[in-house]
Amino acid sequence: MSRTPSAAPFWPYNLGQNLPGSFTARARGLFAPEFVLLGPGEEEFGRLRLGGIGDAQVRAEGFVAAFETSGRRYSMTADGREILTARPKGHSADELEIFCDGRTYKAQISPFRNLALASQLGGEKAACLSGSLTGRSYEALFAAKDRCALPMAIFLLWRIVATRRHAYRAGGAL
């Protein structure tokens, strides 16, 4: 019996309600080990802290979730439970399948263009992320009524930032 990740009990309900489908992320520090997450009126609602190559942590309204990489699988967990999981589609590093709340989403990421788009398999957009040329600020739009969309937007932010960081440390090779 397979267990499908669920965003419902672990993602703060008020957080999704207070963000009207968008947020901004800004790098804090010269080498951007941390991004401040800002809602309407530039109010901080959380932080994304990058760890090593395959891990990070997001803190928002007393909620803490961890991002982890295990082989070709990515996960976002809180209190030991999965909120969402993702894996590359086929051999592509730029296409992901994301699983959350019994649904499957497809995502396209372009780390060097600082863009990401996730949608349900039926085509309805769930999250869109676009960043500045330098990768120090990002704008995210997400479907406010889809409880997986906000964690997915933050997950996409992590994947783009972590991939760019890894590529630059490796001298431009992915």
Question: How would you label these PLM feature ranges?
Answer:
Residues 2-45, 50-55, 91-174:
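Low-complexity or membrane-interfacial segments used for flexible interactions
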Residues 47, 51-82:
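Short, well-structured hydrophobic secondary-structure segments
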Residues 68, 87-88, 108-109:
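Beta-strand C-termini and the immediately following turn/loop, strongest in propeller blades
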Residues 71-100:
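Helix-adjacent hinge/juxtasegments
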